[in-house]
Structure formats: C-alpha cells, structure tokens
Amino acid sequence: MQHTGRRVVKVGVCARLWTPVLHAARIVAVALFAVAGTGIPVVLAEESPPDRGQLLDVHAGGRAVPGLTPGDWDYGWPGAYFEARFSGSAVDIHLSDYQSALAVLIDGQEMKRLDHPGAGVQEIRGLADGEHTIRLIKINESYSDHATFGGFYIPAGETPLPAPTRTRQIEFIGDSETLGLSNLSKRRQCEGSEIVDQTDTRLSFAARTAAHFDADYQIVAMSSRGLLRNYAGLNAPNNMQTYYERAFPYVADKVYQRPASWAPSVVVISLGTNDFSVGLQDGEPWADMDAFRAAYIDSYVAFVGRLRALDPGAYFVLTAKDGYAKEVQAVYDRLQASGETRVAFVHFTGLSLMACNYHPDVGDHASMASAIIAAIDAAGSVWASGGDPVVTGSTVPHAN
C-alpha cells in the first residue's frame, strides 16, 4: 500500500490517515493553450481538499500574530498558545511546525506532546461527548523563523462554543531562565539536544506566575541574550532590547505590530544573567566592567521608560539573581528617584541551579514564581489598569 503524502497520526484512541493541506480553498488553474493544435482551452483543476469541518473561535496568547490566511496564526516566541471550546467528542489541530515542542491539553490535562510535528493535521478522537476546552502551547525555544497554527476544527454535528477569555495580562521579558530552558533536567552537565529537550515553558516562573493570576501572558525571551550585552559579547550589537521589537525572534525585518487588545497590567523584566556571566571580550565597546555596569544601568532605566510609554498604567517587576542584584537594585533606586512608583525589585536567592549549565530547575522556578507573586500581591492595585490606552496597531518604540 502506498501512503505518498500521508501519515498516520495517533492522538487519543483513534488513528487516521491525513493528507497535509494547509489551505482549504479550492485551487483552480485555467491554462489557455491548445490541445494538439485544436485551439480548445484546457482547464486544469487541483483536487479540492476534504472538508475541514467547523473552524472554532480561537483565543491566541503569547506573542502570536495573525497569519496570511484567515484563521491562521504565526508564532515563534516560546509559550505561545491557542485555546478553544466546543461540545462534542472530536477535534482536529492544523499545524505547520518543524521546530517546536508543543503540548496538547484537553480540559487542563495533557493529552499529547508533539515534537517537531511538521505540516498536517493532528486528529483527536474518542473524547467523552460534552463540552471541552482545548489548549495548544509551544513549550520550548526554537531557532527557525516561525511556525503556523492553522486552527482547531470540529466535525459537522458538533457545537462550537465561545473561546476562553481573561481580563488580566502579564508580559515577561527575559532570557533562557525566563522561558524555562532545561528546567526538567536534574543535572548540570548535559549533552547534545538535552538542554532543549528538557525544556517545558509551562513550568517556567513566567508561566507559573501567569497561571496563579489566571492571566494571559507573553514570554518574550531568548537564550544567551542580555539587556545590553549578550553572553560573552556574542551577536553584538543586537541585544534583548533589539529582539523585543520583533514579531519572531529570528526574523529581523518583521516588527511586532502590537494589537490594541494587548495592554499588560504587569511587566516582569529578568535580564542581566548574560550581561554579567562572562567578562568583557576583546573588541567590546566598554573600557572595563565598571564602565559596562554604568552603561547597563543607564540602558535599563531607558528601556523601562520605553515600556512605560507603551503601558502607562503597568506595574513593573525587576528581578535579579546574586550576580547582578546590585545593578538592578541601582536601576530600581534611580527609577524611584525619578518619580516612578509602580515598580518593584525582586532578588532571587537560595536557588539550586541544578539544571543544564546551571540553569534554574523546576524547584527554582516555583520559588522564583512565588517571589514575583508576592511582589505583585504586595502592590495592591496592580490589576486596576490606569493611564492612556495603547494605540491600535502600535509598534514597539525603538531604542535611541
């Protein structure tokens, strides 16, 4: 039996053959040429894809952007997620993703992990007939341009329901620690792809904090990047302030067009580990580490100012580990001295750092989340958003 262009996908209790088709529209090409000199035009028609069923209303979270085809969403940042609700016993997930690890959850319980699923349809069958919530989440960091989520579909006869909604929003800006790189690992010395394979962004301090407050979130975080200086001075002059402007981490010319619906009440910044982990290298623009520290503090204060312009009513949480806590404390002090009142400083202490390459492990992430949650709770009126609304379609302001 030939299975050209098809694959057996097992999700739930049923396996089916599918043909990878990302667009449902019928494609018809008309070729106006003569057959054997007769002058009769020939119509060439590509076979229509099978009926995909009913497209569900989707709640897209994380830094995901609408795709070229209605119903599609493109994503590249870790933690991006898509949610929908329906009444029935079956649902299909349309994807084109060759880089990500993704988790499929039904009613809050993980049903399937998809590692680099490629292009096609993941079919879920055999659910108990009734109302369900499906969630698809990117749980790792990947290094391609972007992937595409093509929607959730249910068969005819099932009932679409309104997508989940939330009223709270938190934005996290950071590095590999923020996205939870290798947090599942139980050892510091890792080999090959282990550091990526042992990652689950759902268990990062960012996702844990958002879950505690039942908040939507964006995780804008990249490994080896710093606020002003990347690990060992790599990829200069780009730094996390540069990448923050992007719709996808590795697409330099695609600026993130921020939707009016995204106006986080809390912004958590966790940048400094890569800035200070390794001493200055030849060719870097600072005379010594003292000069770099001063530049880091200046740049951090300016970055908060840029973010404040986007979210006038947001509450900022600045976090640090031992290696750069004094510098972030100085940022916090300067912001307060300038009249900034909606800001907190959180110093992470007592971390075991037992995951790959001394990254925080799952226990550390739980502790870090608890510290951030305590700071937010202590602020009192964080969720009472103030200030002017964000302009529809606004972009992230560039650094000077």
Locations of regions flagged by a protein language model:
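Sec-dependent signal peptide recognition
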Residues: 23-30
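Alpha-helical cap/lid subdomain in secreted, periplasmic
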Residues: 107, 241-386
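Conserved beta-strand scaffold positions in the cores of enzyme catalytic domains, especially
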Residues: 172, 217-219, 345-347
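N-terminal secretory signal peptides that target proteins for export/translocation
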Residues: 1-22
